[in-house]
Amino acid sequence: MGCVLLFLLLVCVPVVLPQGLRCLFCPVTSLNSSCAPVVTECPVQELCYTADGRFGRSSVLFRKGCMLRADCSRSRHQMIRGNNISFSFSCCGGHYCNSQPRAEPGGRLLLLLLPAAALTAAGAL
């Protein structure tokens, strides 16, 4: 009787195991291309990240996935098609926190120039 009770207890009570974050994964992708992200569950000790790949001063690539917290503050260099690309990482600790769309190249500059263009067109400058 005791073995049956123990068996029923083990079967009926769910085992709670620590779960990792759910993040989006995109392989290295060109900024002018799109990625169909795949949902992935990170190991418990990892965070979600979005990486910005730069060639010189220009953002040219991005990627998303999971990485160890200790690696979030490190930049990495990778040779891609003969070009030395420097990746910097932005990590976050919530489910799907790396799902925000990437900024379009030059988007911030465009936002800064729009008010000046509007004033110029209105003859205020």
Curated annotation (Swiss-Prot):
Q: Which GO terms describe its cellular component?
A: membrane; plasma membrane; side of membrane
Residues covered by the UPAR/Ly6 domain:
23-98
CDD domains assigned = TFP_LU_ECD_Bncr (cd23597)
Keywords assigned: Cell membrane, Disulfide bond, Fertilization, Glycoprotein, GPI-anchor, Lipoprotein, Membrane, Signal
Q: In which broad location class does this protein mainly occur, judging by the first location in its UniProt entry?
A: membrane
One biological process term in Gene Ontology: fusion of sperm to egg plasma membrane involved in single fertilization
Keyword DNA repair tagged: no
Q: Identify the tissues in which this protein is expressed.
A: Highly expressed in oocytes. Not expressed in testis.
Q: How does it sit in the membrane?
A: Lipid-anchor; GPI-anchor
Where, subcellularly, is it found?
Answer: Cell membrane
* Intrachain disulfide bonds: C23-C48, C26-C35, C42-C66, C72-C91, C92-C97
Glycosylation (residues): N32, N84
**Does the keyword field hold Cell membrane?**
yes
Question: Which stretches of the sequence are propeptide?
Answer: 99-125
Effect of mutating N32A: Glycosylation-defective mutant. Does not affect ability to promote fertilization and mediate sperm-egg binding
- PTM (free text): N-glycosylated.
Signal peptide (from-to)? 1-18
Quaternary structure?
Answer: Interacts with spermatocyte complex composed of izumo1, spaca6 and tmem81.
Give the protein family. Answer: Belongs to the SPACA4/bouncer family.
Q: What else is known?
A: Was named bouncer (bncr) in reference to the colloquial name of a security guard at a bar.
Function, as annotated: Oocyte-expressed fertilization factor that mediates sperm-egg binding and is essential for sperm entry into the egg. Necessary and sufficient to mediate species-specific gamete recognition and fertilization, which is essential for vertebrate species performing external fertilization. External fertilization cannot guarantee that only conspecific sperm reaches the egg by precopulatory mate choice: proteins such as Bouncer can therefore support the selection of conspecific sperm.
Name of the protein in question? Protein Bouncer
As recorded in Swiss-Prot or TrEMBL, the protein's gene is named: bncr
